[in-house]
């Protein structure tokens, strides 16, 4: 099929001490968002963890971990898609492609 429109996917960086004010605005404006974790162990800051919990029921949240370690986001109660082997830009493009097909139910398979 021919793709006429790509989905809107935002990107936000997370770090220790992040107040997530900007992230809240971005997540309210996009169909999906890529969160880039810049912590040493790959975890999200407490404020970002809560924000992701709040929004992941109505938008797809993809987490890219810059540390190279595999972090268990489900243990933090997060319903996110992990992109352990992708850069943030690759994850953003993949999310845009996933948004073009509303029949895709398991996004994680595209991010493995």
Language-model regions: role of each:
Residues 1-112:
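Active-site catalytic microenvironments in core metabolic enzymes, especially phosphate/sugar-handling
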């Amino acid at each position: 099929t021919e793709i006429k429109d790509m989905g809107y996917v935002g990107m936000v960086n997370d770090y220790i001490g992040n107040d997530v004010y900007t992230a809240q605005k971005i997540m309210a404006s996009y169909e999906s968002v890529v969160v880039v974790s810049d912590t040493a162990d790959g975890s999200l800051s407490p404020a970002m963890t809560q924000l992701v919990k709040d929004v992941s029921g109505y938008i797809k949240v993809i987490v890219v971990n810059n540390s190279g370690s595999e972090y268990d986001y489900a243990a933090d109660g997060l319903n996110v898609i992990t992109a352990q082997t992708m850069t943030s830009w690759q994850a953003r493009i993949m999310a845009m492609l996933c948004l073009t097909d509303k029949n895709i139910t398991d996004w994680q398979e595209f991010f493995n």
